[in-house]
Amino acid sequence: IRLKKDRFELDELARAVAVTKAGFDDIIRALPRAVGHRRGERVIEGAFRAVAREEGNGEGYETIAASGNHANTLHWIDNDGEVREGDLVLVDAGVEVDSLYTADITRTLPVNGRFTEVQARVYQAVLDACEAALARANQPGCRFKDVHDAAMGVIAARLHEWGILPVTPEESLASEGQQHRRWMPHGTSHHLGLDVHDCAKARSELYQGALLEPGMVFTIEPGLYFRADDMLIPEEYRGIGVRIEDDVVVNSDGSVTRISEDIPRTVADVEAWIARVQAG
């Protein structure tokens, strides 16, 4: 029953996403203060928590506010690091509304408002993976696991283009390969609802192997993670971690659309968003 949401549930999830957007706006307002604080990541976490508590029941899960190399720790929840000019900050956060339905959104923001060339290159690769996953979800006969496979096709191709992947994309994508998973080690999607990882214990044939059906709500969240101490990659990539996560719904006609479409995510739109919010 929980795998497919009814109208009430869909409305609550949309409300959770809308309040989460407000929380991200306050994160952007807090970025200058975060830069000057010895625990700037907690300034970001606190800004989001205030909105979650004031406008909802609270945070749907522990906020990840990961600046710089901390973004390369997938569930960085200590949030005790500095936030430095020129770095990216990866924020994975969601508001749980009073009905207990939660959003789950990730945005990777340039702390000073502008991406560097290499940051934008990595970011665009992740965004392209998001778009490929959404496009596959909109094709007839798509199974849940196909969404991940589509995203990984882009990730493997970009890693190969940059000279990072030690094999061809086809070899990496084969079950006996998977070399790309060094830099993208997690799944692309999970169901969303009362739990941030909704229906996590569902049988495989009802989850990964299931056809997408109207009422399903899930995330699309590929990433690329280049640790600062990774000697297998060019130096310019080291310390950069990017994830982009949206919440999507399968509509009654079978199309899949982003519930979180109002939260900017392209390079240009993110930069404009930061400038607009900080201008007041």
What are these regions (language model features)?
Residues I1-G280:
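Active-site neighborhoods and metal-handling regions in enzymes and metal-associated proteins
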